[in-house]
């Protein structure tokens, strides 16, 4: 008799999230009867306000794999501290597998200068002025995870001042 209000709440909460598929790949598993085919989707989820996550989903059809990838990406969200010019505070490096990514802050008006999966992650994180370079592997999943690792390593000025135990005004004097 009681109606569920959960569905209305979920729609309003999820409306500001964007999702982009980086890669869809057909994968197979060898079983006794032959090969069992399935699809693997790598999905980036972000709100362009400083939250982003990378998820992987695998299912028998593409739509199911993307849906699982979005759910996985929302479980692995990280917070990125943005500056007033929609950039980052300092240079950061990230590694995942054989992929290495270097991200550098850029002047206002520069735009996102990056390629492939790295560009997608940075755009969905809300970064508008940033430079990035991929080194090593071209694997989209490892590059996406490497840029997530780089963004996790970022610290704000207030965090640095708190770690050093000095007021923010006296940080660089």
From Swiss-Prot:
Listed GO MF terms: rRNA binding; structural constituent of ribosome
Residue ranges constituting the S5 DRBM domain according to the UniProt record: 17-80
UniProt KW keywords: Ribonucleoprotein, Ribosomal protein, RNA-binding, rRNA-binding
GO terms (BP aspect): translation
SUPFAM superfamilies, alphabetized: dsRNA-binding domain-like, Ribosomal protein S5 domain 2-like
Annotated Gene Ontology cellular component terms: small ribosomal subunit
Superkingdom of origin organism: Bacteria
Lipid biosynthesis keyword on record: no
Endpoints of the signal sequence: none
Pfam family, any one: Ribosomal_S5_C
The UniProt record lists the keyword Hydrolase: no
Main function: With S4 and S12 plays an important role in translational accuracy.
Subunit structure of this chain's protein: Part of the 30S ribosomal subunit. Contacts proteins S4 and S8.
Family: Belongs to the universal ribosomal protein uS5 family.
Domain notes per entry: The N-terminal domain interacts with the head of the 30S subunit; the C-terminal domain interacts with the body and contacts protein S4. The interaction surface between S4 and S5 is involved in control of translational fidelity.
Official protein name in the record: Small ribosomal subunit protein uS5
Species name: Crocosphaera subtropica (strain ATCC 51142 / BH68) (Cyanothece sp. (strain ATCC 51142))
